[in-house]
């Protein structure tokens, strides 16, 4: 079986909504290649192990790569996706580009691994692919062994890095953590490495739960993290000290009240996946519900907010 790689170059303002359209139409993962990441490469303060390659990024804007099963990707679906994208108010119609290529099953399964190498994601955390060998550079370094699978991120996105930095700052061993939209499980593993004993990882996608469980096994914490399917926090009855959600902004907006109600007094809501054009609305909503915003990080057009539950 082959796969169709649909490549779209668009402006930054349309990235979140375009990604949502692709995922809603059945894309098996979306790769985001942001030209800002090449122009504004992070300082080498965390000892990044490899440099970004110019040929992997568009000259300007953002390249989205979506992957569709050849059995379901037909002319009707192709046109439907294109029509919905071109109808986005945020889209710059003059600079959008579409292209496609066919990827054989064997290439699809392995080619992406060529771009995933060990890297320092934050001051403490280093992400290590499960198929590579890596030696710690310092005793305090915390290594997360990761095999994200084809449909989940490798941890190098700015939103993940900012969440890891927030975990370093606000999560303590005595805390309890719930990770909403866990994906590969990277943020739950980071919390475990900090020393947290009670961790629950949720994802609406059962494939994500399966991938997360395998990564928990690789990091020797499969019996210490509860990984279950879950629709955000709608059915959650337990209380936690930390709620983490690195998901899309419109989904975060839906769960702010539930996050507040799930937290113990003084607990923290760590959330990212928010493009800069959306963060003020998310921040205002959090404040209306009762959160005190105590941290705001920005990185290449993405934002991470930390709100604390503090009653009047």
Curated annotation (Swiss-Prot):
Protein's organism: Staphylococcus aureus (strain COL)
Organism domain of life: Bacteria
NCBIfam families per the UniProt record, alphabetical: prmA
The name this protein goes by in its record: Ribosomal protein L11 methyltransferase
CDD domains: AdoMet_MTases (cd02440)
InterPro entries found in the cross-reference section: Ribosomal_L11_MeTrfase_PrmA, Ribosomal_PrmA_MeTrfase, SAM-dependent_MTases_sf
Keywords, in A-Z order: Cytoplasm, Methyltransferase, S-adenosyl-L-methionine, Transferase
Family, per entry: Belongs to the methyltransferase superfamily. PrmA family.
Gene: prmA
Enzyme class: transferase
Catalysed reactions listed for this entry: L-lysyl-[protein] + 3 S-adenosyl-L-methionine = N(6),N(6),N(6)-trimethyl-L-lysyl-[protein] + 3 S-adenosyl-L-homocysteine + 3 H(+)
Main function: Methylates ribosomal protein L11.
GO process annotations (BP): methylation
One cellular component term from this protein's GO annotations in UniProt: cytoplasm
Main location: cytoplasm
Enzyme Commission code(s) on record: 2.1.1.-
Entry binding sites for S-adenosyl-L-methionine: 160, 181, 203, 246
Compartment(s): Cytoplasm
One GO molecular-function entry: protein-lysine N-methyltransferase activity
């Amino acid at each position: 079986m082959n796969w169709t790689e649909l490549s779209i170059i668009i402006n930054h303002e349309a990235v979140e909504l375009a990604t949502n359209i692709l995922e809603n139409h059945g894309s098996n993962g979306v790769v985001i290649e942001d030209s800002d990441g090449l122009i504004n490469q992070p300082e080498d303060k965390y000892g990044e192990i490899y440099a970004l390659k110019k040929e992997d990024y568009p000259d300007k804007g953002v390249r989205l790569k979506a992957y569709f099963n050849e059995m379901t990707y037909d002319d009707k679906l192709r046109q439907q996706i294109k029509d919905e994208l071109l109808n986005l108010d945020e889209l710059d119609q003059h600079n959008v580009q579409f292209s496609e290529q066919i990827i054989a099953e064997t290439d699809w399964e392995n080619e992406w691994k060529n771009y995933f190498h060990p890297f320092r994601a934050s001051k403490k955390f280093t992400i290590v692919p499960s198929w590579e060998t890596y030696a710690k550079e310092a005793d305090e370094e915390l290594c997360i062994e990761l095999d994200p699978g084809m449909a989940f991120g490798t941890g190098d996105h700015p939103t993940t890095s900012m969440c890891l930095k927030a975990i370093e700052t606000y999560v303590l061993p005595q805390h309890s953590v719930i990770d909403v939209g866990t994906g590969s499980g990277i943020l739950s593993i980071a919390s475990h490495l900090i020393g947290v004993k009670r961790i629950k990882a949720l994802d609406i996608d059962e494939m994500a739960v399966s991938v997360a469980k395998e990564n928990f096994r690789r990091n020797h914490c499969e019996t210490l993290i509860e990984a279950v399917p879950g629709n955000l926090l709608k059915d959650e009855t337990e209380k936690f000290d930390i709620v983490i959600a690195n998901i899309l902004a419109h989904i975060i907006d839906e769960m702010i009240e539930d996050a507040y109600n799930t937290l113990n007094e003084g607990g923290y809501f760590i959330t990212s996946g928010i493009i800069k054009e959306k963060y003020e609305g998310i921040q205002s909503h959090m404040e209306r519900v009762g959160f005190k915003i105590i941290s705001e990080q920005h990185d290449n057009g993405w934002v991470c907010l930390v709100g604390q539950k503090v009653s009047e």
